[in-house]
Each structure stands twice: as structure tokens, then as C-alpha cells.
Amino acid sequence: MSVKTFAAIDVGSFELTMKIFDLSGKNTMREIDCIRQRIDLGSDTYAHGKISNEKIDDLCHTLKEFAQIMESYKVTAYKAYGTSAIRETQNTLILQDQIEQRTGIRVETLSNSEQRFLDYKSIASKGETFRRIIEEKTAILDIGGGS
């Protein structure tokens, strides 16, 4: 079965973002929704070395809502990635286990290099727009939240 609707979830240092895409056109991807929820995971990780139980509860609650939204859109595939706050917390494995058990969503942790690669790849995927901006002197800067 081919993927028709795809969700991408970014568990960032300061915010969770889920984008839903329609992939039904030939070689096209159309964003059909973007949901954001501010949860400051980074403040726990960077100040205390681990994410608090309260923030884990907030995170799981939001991801459950994301799962319901994915169901309403009939999402057939998803990817969920954690970045700096997840990568650098002392309780990464416990956190990932809690998320998967409580929400059914598996969050993979990206290394800093993997995160940057995906960011640049998404910019380059803009096709003609990307080709046009790199014809002149161009700098692409990554100003991330936590990394």
C-alpha cells in the first residue's frame, strides 16, 4: 500500500510541531496542516540534566492529541524525531519508552549532524527556488533552538 498521507513530528527543545502532508500527486508533496504546541523541554535538559515527570506528562498528552489528529487525517505513515533536548537529557531511554507506551508514537533521536542534514535537505528539496537562490552568493544558517 502506498503512502497517501504522511505526518512529520519534530519534538524540539521549545516546541512540538506536526506537519501533515498529502502525497497523492506524482512526485508532489502538499502540506495540509501544521500543528504546534509549546513545551519547553530544553529548560529542564539544559538546567537540570533531565526532563521532569511533569514535562513528560505534558509531552505525552500533546503526542496523544497528535495521534488523534493523525487518525482523523487517515495518516498512513509518520516519522517522529527528537532533537537537542531529547538527545542531551540523562533520561533519554526512559523518556522514549514512556512516550511509546503512553502514546504509541516512536520518537527517534537525531544526532546534531543528522538534524542539520535533514534541515539542509528540506531546503534543497524546494527545487527551482533553491536553484535560484544558490546562483548568487548564498549562506544558509542553522540557528537551532538547543543545539
Predicted regions and their residues:
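Nucleotide/phosphate-binding catalytic cleft detector across ATP-hydrolyzing
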Residues: 1-11, 19-143
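Primarily the dimerization/phosphotransfer
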Residues: 14
